[in-house]
Amino acid sequence: MKDINECIQQYLSAWHSRNDDNEYVSAGITGLSATEILQMFEHPALRLPEHKHAGVSLMVDLMAENDSMYFDAIYGAMYGREDIRGWLIPMMKEIDFIEFTPTQPSAVFTRASDTWTLDEWQMFAVFGDDRIPLPKGVSVRRYVDGFITQACDVYDTASMRQPGPDGSVADIPGVPVVNWVRDHSVPDHRIGMTDVSKLCTQFHPTESVYIDPVHGEFHGRDAIAAWLSTHLAGMQNVVREAVGPALTNGATSVQEWQHILVQPNGERTFLTRGTSVQRTDGQFITYAADYYDAASLPSA
């Protein structure tokens, strides 16, 4: 295990000495495990004013040079370290009034060929003493040989596409279209065929919460079951297709997916890209959250 304090100081020293934002910095970040990288991202030094923007540079420098993809729910997919750098760093500087606050503990999932991490967060627009809550989101990253090969940030962009008080609409692109690679190791699931009763027996009777970005929070098994019964009944022709492996570490599980509307004639219509998270107490599900972009849904 490396000394993360030493690693972060090496990186920050080199970062401050670089010639410009496009320069790759490797000091302190070579040969790290996914757990060590996660500790780097969470290091308090990155929150200090003198190191502003170092965190996003760190993430870019840890992307695999060529075989990497970063996905943002508004701007879509970028490929390769330098293309990701060319977009992400200027964008984060442009929106540096937005803070990302963790909402749940991060998690690590170790497999034979790769490692994945999970972060759940909420955005806040900060203007002086005012903190305006923005959508919650989730980041899922894949690591191979000390580099990030895939990073996907999923959140609901629908509210960001609505007219403001003055009637103006944010200058952002339409909902991105990505040809997601399906993970056939996870069976497709027809949402309308969900056995809600069986599913909900897995939730803690009282100390459980289910969170939907559009419909809100439901607390306790009975409330969760009542809402899911109604909600899922309206999704008879919707199929959930995995676009990532089923990840679990015993306490937390993650599944990345896309919803497809499959008509009786076989016609397929993309609905939304999402990520589901569940956390347990060892016996019951105590926390479940679905993250997806409602802006891509037909009724949005």
Ranges and model annotations:
Residues 1-300:
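C-terminal and inter-domain tail/linker signature
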